[in-house]
Amino acid sequence: MKKSIWIAWKDVKIRITDRKGFMMLILMPLILTCILGAALGSVVDGGSRIDDIKVGYIQSDQSDTANMFTKDVLKKMKSIKVTKVGSKDKMKKLIDEKKIDVGIVIPNHWEAGKTSAVVNAAPDQTLKSSIIETAASSFIEQYKAVKEAASGSMDYISKTEAVKQGKLDPAQFAEKLAKTLEKETGDKLTIAEKSVGSKAVTSFQYYSAAMLCMFMLFHITVGAKSFLQEKDTETLARMLMTPAQKSVILFGKWLGTYLFAIIQFFIFLIVTINVFGVDWGGNLLLVSVLGLSYAAAVSGISMLLASCISDMKTADAIGGFGIQLLAVLGGSMLPLYQFPDVLQSVSKAVPNRWALDGFLSLMEGGGWADLQKPVLLFAAIGFCSLVIGIRRLHTR
């Protein structure tokens, strides 16, 4: 074990004194966090609060249902300001002039469900247009359900003895039922602005976690390249000639990568807390557990990669294109919620996505329950990659 620690410490000292490596893994993520957190604040922070939605409204359908949607849904929502518009051309002009955020047209026969509401908005108002579109579609779906429920109830009531004996007036009952259900339909639709967790994540928080997850990935190639460099300079061959077992030497190489990843993690954590004022959540112990397990995973993958490649060009290619691809898929470049469904599914196959989700959960007020899956996953990845990598390198 002492020999493994000695080998690990040797690698750590080499990487600390490497100015290029220090800039890449320590300073660069901090610089990018500062730039992205400030420049793209509207992309992330914009999702944590919805400003008042200015809606232009054209109502071609003059049915009671369409009137109820305007009166009991749109006009009762505090965050929506409704303006009646005379024509579609006027609506388009108001959208272009930024006087309204969203335009909605209720066409003829909307009540019957034969046509859908048409929602128009500027390209930068997709969230607000989605809210209005969802409100309209939810309302009409609830109205249909109410109508079917009322129809079914009346069919049942009309067959009862009370109606047959004249003790119950079906028309009066139907009127009361309709009013009650209509009121419920309008009252059910509200907009609640709420974070997924107990706290909302700011842009600096998001990109602090995102940059940390991305730059810790570089240890995959840094560890593999360190192994290849020592192989090319025959340093590894000289170490293998010593009485130390091969597995001890190889474990020491993994430990060196792991220790440097830990150093990077804690430096980044301390600087973002004290300089940028980033809140990583109420429990830094859980943040550390997640960071340490993620570091173990990327260090294990570095040994597996070292066992699969034999030249520096391949390592450089993976370090360039491969790591950037993982960073994009894992949400380090753009927030995950902006991904289409297909990429959302694909991103779950990369480790940095799990790490980012874990850090964000802690920032939102989550606890150990949110970390169990990623921590166990990273432990499994790190252990399996280390064992397979050492066995492959041992035979080589």
UniProtKB/Swiss-Prot annotation:
It is found in: Cell membrane. Gene3D superfamilies: abc type-2 transporter like domain. Induction: Induced in response to linearmycins and other polyenes via the two-component regulatory system LnrJ/LnrK. GO terms for cellular component: plasma membrane. The chain crosses the membrane at residues 21-41, 204-224, 258-278, 284-304, 317-337, 370-390. Residues 161-396 form the ABC transmembrane type-2 domain. InterPro entries: ABC-2_transporter_component, ABC2_TM, ABC2_TM_bact-type. It comes from the Bacteria. The keyword Transport applies. The keyword Transmembrane helix applies. Keywords: Cell membrane, Membrane, Transmembrane, Transmembrane helix, Transport. One of its GO terms (molecular function) is ABC-type transporter activity. PANTHER family: LINEARMYCIN RESISTANCE PERMEASE PROTEIN LNRM, MEMBRANE COMPONENT OF ABC TRANSPORTER YHHJ-RELATED. The complex is composed of two ATP-binding proteins (LnrL) and two transmembrane proteins (LnrM and LnrN). Belongs to the ABC-2 integral membrane protein family. This is Linearmycin resistance permease protein LnrM.
